[in-house]
Amino acid sequence: MFTYVSKFFTNPDRNREDILESLDRENSFLDQKLMEEKMDQQLKANPNEINGVLSNKIAELTHGLSEMDVSKESSCTARKGVITSLDGDRGVIDKDVLFETKVAEDIILDLHVGCVVEYLTFTTGEAMRVVKVKSILEHSWEDTSQKEIEKAVDNLKNEKPTFFNTETRSVLGLISQRLASSIDVETEYGQLTVELDNIEMNFIPTNGDRVRLECNIQLDDGFVDKQGEILEVTKLFPTRIQEGEKCIVERVYVHMVVLGPETYILKTDLPTGTDLHLGDIVLADLIECQYSKFTRRAIKITPLEKNFGATKLTQQSSMGSSGSGKAVTVTGVNRFITAELWQKESVSLKLTNNLNRTLRLESITVCNDSESQLSVVSPLESKEISSGSEITVTFEIHTQFLGEAIEKYVLNFDLLKVRRVFTVIVCKTKEEVAEAEKRMIAAEALMAPGRNSQERSRFYANQVWCNKVDVIPGQQIVTKRRFVALRLGCFEVPKELRQICLTSERRQEMIKAIEQHYSFLTEPLSIKTYMHRFRLLLHLEEIECFVNFRNYDRDRAHFLRDGEFLTLQIENLAERRPSLVIGDTLRVINPWSDPDSQTTKSYEGIIHKVLFDRILLKFHSSFQEKYNGEDYRLEFYFSRYSFRKQHHAISKIVGVMGEDFLFPSKVTKRENPQLDVYMKDDDMYLYDSKLEWYNQSLNSIQKRAVFNILRGEAENIPYVLFGPPGSGKTMTLIETLLQLVRNLPGARILVGTPSNSSADLVTKRLIDSKALLQGDFIRLVSYNQVEKDLIPPEIMSYCATSDVGAVGSCEDKMMVTESGLKLRCQAKFIGTHRITISTCTTLGNFLQLGFPAGHFTHVLFDEAGQCTEPETMVPIVMLTKKRSQVVLSGDPRQLQSIVTSRIASKMGFSISFLERLLERSPYRKDLQRFPESSGYNPLVLTKLLYNYRALPSIMSIYSRLFYDDELIPVLSEKDSRESRLLSKLRCVFESEKDIPQAHGTFFYGIIGENRQNNDSPSWFNPQEVREVFLMTIALYRANVTADQIGIITPYQKQVKMLRSMFIGTDVVMPKIGSVEEFQGQERDIILISTVRSSEEILRMDARFSLGFVRCSKRLNVAVSRARAMMIIFGNPHLLAVDECWRQLILFCVKNNAYFGCDLPQMVINQKDEVPVCLETFVPSLNTTDDLN
């Protein structure tokens, strides 16, 4: 040892380095002092001049010194020292550095007092800790004296430590052992012991959990990834948390509950007072684990639905005893409840063959038989059951553990399989047995027909609605204005209507009770019933929204802090419906409080931001500042502002516009036209001046529509621009706007749309026209659009939000962002532009700004068919009856507005104002009166006919089926981009087929299977998923890009299955979505998956307008999206029952464009009746000039 130490006395280089380092430190200190003295002198001479220089120099000097200090005082060092003490599991180095002997790892047995060792330290704050004893540099002699050890310690004090940089990194691991205050974690760097008292964590770890450790690590260039030793573990998290996963209780043990084949929860993690039983449905926060057969562990649950011990499987088993419509009936007991462990009991069941042929029971399979308490006694061999006869099956139950379990078994017949379950409950006492029996009886009553989960959710919604507690309001997004020009009424839902909707057990009973209580529902809609009917329909829609919002409620939840906000994690928030938006609220309630108590209070949290998987809230300061991670019960509420605006409009519109506007029965001409223009050929003149068209590519029908609107000869009646798919509705609307602004100086126009995307499109088209200056028009947006960053950058400088505060009643706080977005504009800044574009309900913000009558002169709607009538009335109510004009542009034969309440939809709420008007006499088709305008009165309606979207062989389908065979194709079937693309893509079909060169519609017949998962009411068809995927691959091989393809299917489950197929195979995914997602869009190639293959399910679709079959509007949208090619995948035997689908299939058959399974007989019998040529679908054109 002394040989090693002596080196430090004979090393002149090392002494020289130490001297030079000391001189450097002294020089730096002296330089700093000299600088300070110089600054003091200059400051005394000229204090004003030196001020700025002084602060800059001091800052530079301080920065340089701090950098020097940091580099010299790294928290991780490698040092050399002498072991001065060893006592069991602890030791001391250099008399003052304590360490645990386990940090020596492999060399622990070689450690002795007097050894010179190299060790790694990590300093946090004032404390230095030995992380690892790396090696023994010099072993000690047995007769080494204490004096010699002290001398070696003194000599080593001059040894310069090696400094290492540190970094925070994540290390993944698996907990192998859980002790009282520590865990052992297996990592790729070896076993690591983590003291739980010294780290941050968000869950209680246990054996088998997969975890992520946030560690400070040593950066060592000796390793490839530069990671040396793990110095300190600071945080412990699960590798992943899946929040809000729906799980069903499958087994209940003494210490744990099984929530699925791979999921469990420890009973210690259950909320206090929660007792789970078989069949209970819970929302669980799951983490990854590796424990026995389980891969997921629930760390927190929220009970969602109590089933008291019965499951849908056991209910199915008991229901099977009725035998109604079943091939095999299973009768007998389906549960066994006892208080004895290791008891054996035989149970017998009877199997009845309900078919008219003999069945063979080949075997009985007990699922998971190694753990099951159920075993088969007889029959052990195959056995035949003749038609109408029965056999006995005997099982033995052997109770093996306390708790509840579902034992599954399968009856394997020669033609089918019958799955059944048996419930086994083992209790501790006979009293518990009696309680379990009561629970099972209650469960069967609860799951009886007529009390499904949807009806139970309504009962819960009623409880929430009836809970009246004091609410302490949260912090508003913007300051609530005390003075506004017009205050909207509250328009609360009547108590009696709420009681009917939320307490009726069956829908038919609900409808009957509503009609009895509100007798005007049985009368036709008229000016007398108008306000009452639509107010009721709005209330029904609000009630349904309230019920749907209960899906967000939680029995237990906690918040996390994020700056000035409290945040709440919500899994899959972006995909959930109804959506949460800024301004919605939630209320937090103490879960232990008595809801009936007068002292119970709740705090309101207002949503200020909505992110991908969490929301940011602000509460009253008394809650926000003191919150410390406690759990609360949460109830969510939507903002009623939109409903209130619609109620206000409905209550005023009758008085503002009158019966002639709402229920037109005749066309009355004005004394003078709105604008005295006239048409000569395709040119428009005002007086003797020719008016230039902004868009020179408009066809003659579009120009005529603009002319009719400008003249505005009809008195107080809406003008309808009827535009089939691809006919240029928006293009015509833009031209109308520009002509109104140029030729009517007093015009101030509102443009209303059903969605933000369509409002953005109108804004972009106006910008692209370059006909108006910035400031002539404005795009009114909501705060929700701003906060979610949903405004396209190219229109940002044209957008603004409004402030409803009365002018002069509050400080003007309008702000303009760097992008040009104007925020919080009061009436003096907004509402005075020539054109204001927004969604219908956002335009309703102007209702409270107090504009005088006649302030707005025109309201134009784009996609008016997708607006409900109350939404349409919101901007119209700001007009006056005289000298105003309303234009409705849309297609009533495409999808309607989305209405969540089925009852309201059935009562006409989903019918748009546009669609209702077309049933009135002035808008009806009369070819005899108006032969030159497709049979419509040009004073009130123009139907656009030229189709710019699709090849004739695609357009002809929806033209014939939905538009009286009147549409005129503009695209050439011989010389157009689409026709050349179609010609290139013919390679994806069978070469021997004699398909007409210009034919772009194809049908692929598949006898598939529609399936439905237990956790979703939506449907999917795996055979169609496969064929659609293979066709997409074939198109890619033909050099088609993903943005040229669209895949449409009516069911969300099929959408998910298709997306999973592309993601799982790492193939570029085209746009895949429902019909609603494709309305207003187009693609070169459209693939349609119809999904359904069951007649029984088709009957249900017809009732609820699901799928494509017998829902003409959905079919119309689906088949009108393609430009060059459309391929439909479906079951022709089922689709052909519908007349529209049969015509489409026949069209493909006659053009040799049908592939796949055999055709149904009804199509074969009829195919000779359908002409092969396309002329039956496309109007003949006399000259090519008509297309120009």
Swiss-Prot record:
Purpose: Probable RNA helicase required for axial polarization of the oocyte during early and mid oogenesis. Plays a central role in RNA interference (RNAi) process, a process that mediates mRNA destruction of translational repression. Required for the assembly of the RISC complex, a complex required for target RNA destruction or repression. May be required in the RISC assembly to unwind miRNAs, in the production of single-stranded miRNA from the double-stranded miRNA, a key step in RISC formation.
Assigned keywords, A-Z: ATP-binding, Cytoplasm, Developmental protein, Helicase, Hydrolase, Nucleotide-binding, RNA-mediated gene silencing
The protein's enzyme class: hydrolase
Keyword ATP-binding (UniProt): yes
Gene that produces this protein: armi
Protein name according to UniProt: Probable RNA helicase armi
Catalytic activity annotation: ATP + H2O = ADP + phosphate + H(+)
Annotated EC: 3.6.4.13
Organism ancestry: Eukaryota, Metazoa, Ecdysozoa, Arthropoda, Hexapoda
